[in-house]
C-alpha cells in the first residue's frame, strides 16, 4: 500500500482501500476496479453514474471560442465543444460514491478547474485522480503539459490528491512499436521523486510488455507508485499481453482501464466476475 496515501475519504486514499472499505471489491487487487472511460457528454456521464464502474474518467479542456471567461468543459480532443461543463459534471458526480479521474488537456484549464473543485471539496470524500501527459513517450507527437506549473498549480489547491502522470504515445499497426525507454522512465522518476503524493502512471497496453524491465524499475522506486493500463481504440494487443503484465507486477500496483472485448476476456481468464 502507498505509505503516503491519505486517510479514509481523502483524495489521496488508495482506491483499493476506499472500495474495500465500501464493500465494493473483495481483495486488494487492481484488476477488480472497473472503469467508465470518457464520461464527457451528459448522456455518457449519466450512463457512467448508473453503471457498476468504480471509477469515472473524463477529460477537461477550455472551449474553442477562447473567450477569457470560458468555463472548463468536458470533451476529448479533437472535440472542442460539449453539452457538459465541469461544474455541471461535478454536480452530478457528487451524488454518487464513485471515484474520479480528471484528465487535463492543457495547462490553461487547470487553475479554473481547481477553483471549481475547491467549491465542492467538502462533498467529495473519495479518491480524486488528476491526470496529465507531462513527458513525450513512445511515438508520442501530441503536446505535453509542462510538468512544473501543472504540479505546482494542483498542489497549491490540493496537496492531498492522487496524481496520474503519463507520457504522450502513439501506436502504428504497420511497424514495430518501441516501448517505454530507460530515458523516459528515468525522466518520470526524476519528477515524481520530489512529490509526496501517490502517483499512478498511465501506460499503453500495447507498449507495456516490451517495457517490463523499465516499468518494474520505476515501480520499485517508491511504494507511492502504481500503473494504470489503458488502451487505444485500434491498438493491437492480446489478452496474453495483459496476463504477462499480471504475472510480473504486484496485483496491488496495477489497474486496468481497458476496452472490450479484451477487458471481459482478461477478467474471465483471471477469475474476476464482470458485471455487464
Curated annotation (Swiss-Prot):
- GO BP terms, alphabetized: photoreceptor cell development
Q: Which domain of life is it from?
A: Eukaryota
InterPro entries associated with the record? Memorin
A Pfam family recorded for this sequence? Menorin
List the GO cellular component terms. extracellular space
In which family does this protein belong, per the annotation? Belongs to the menorin family.
PANTHER family hit by this protein: MENORIN (DENDRITIC BRANCHING PROTEIN), PROTEIN FAM151B
What does this protein do, in the record's words?
A: Essential for survival of retinal photoreceptor cells.
What name is this protein filed under? Protein FAM151B
Q: Which organism is it from?
A: Homo sapiens
Amino acid at each position: 500500500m502507498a505509505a503516503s496515501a491519505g486517510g479514509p475519504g481523502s483524495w489521496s486514499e488508495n482506491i483499493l482501500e476506499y472500495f474495500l472499505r465500501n464493500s465494493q471489491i473483495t481483495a486488494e487487487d487492481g484488476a477488480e476496479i472497473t472503469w467508465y472511460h470518457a464520461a464527457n457528454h451528459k448522456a455518457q456521464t449519466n450512463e457512467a453514474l448508473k453503471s457498476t464502474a468504480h471509477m469515472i474518467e473524463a477529460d477537461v479542456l477550455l472551449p474553442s471560442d477562447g473567450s477569457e471567461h470560458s468555463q472548463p468543459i468536458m470533451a476529448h480532443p479533437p472535440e472542442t465543444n460539449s453539452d457538459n461543463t465541469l461544474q455541471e459534471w461535478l454536480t452530478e458526480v457528487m451524488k454518487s460514491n464513485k471515484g474520479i479521474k480528471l484528465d487535463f488537456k492543457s495547462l490553461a484549464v487547470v487553475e479554473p478547474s481547481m477553483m471549481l473543485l475547491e467549491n465542492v471539496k467538502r462533498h467529495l470524500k473519495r479518491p480524486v485522480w488528476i491526470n496529465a501527459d507531462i513527458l513525450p513517450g513512445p511515438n508520442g507527437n501530441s503536446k505535453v503539459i509542462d510538468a512544473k506549473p501543472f504540479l505546482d498549480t494542483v498542489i497549491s489547491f490540493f496537496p492531498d490528491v492522487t496524481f496520474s502522470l503519463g507520457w504522450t504515445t502513439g501506436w502504428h499497426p504497420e511497424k514495430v512499436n518501441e516501448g517505454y525507454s530507460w530515458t523516459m522512465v528515468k525522466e518520470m522518476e526524476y519528477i515524481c521523486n520530489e512529490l509526496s503524493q501517490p502517483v499512478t502512471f498511465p501506460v499503453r497496453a500495447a507498449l507495456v510488455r516490451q517495457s517490463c524491465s523499465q516499468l518494474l524499475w520505476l515501480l520499485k522506486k517508491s511504494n507511492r507508485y502504481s500503473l494504470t493500463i489503458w488502451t487505444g481504440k485500434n491498438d493491437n494487443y492480446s489478452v496474453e499481453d495483459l496476463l504477462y503484465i499480471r504475472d510480473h507486477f504486484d496485483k496491488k500496483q496495477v489497474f486496468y482501464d481497458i476496452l472490450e472485448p479484451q477487458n471481459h476476456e482478461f477478467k474471465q481468464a483471471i477469475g474476476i466476475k464482470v458485471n455487464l
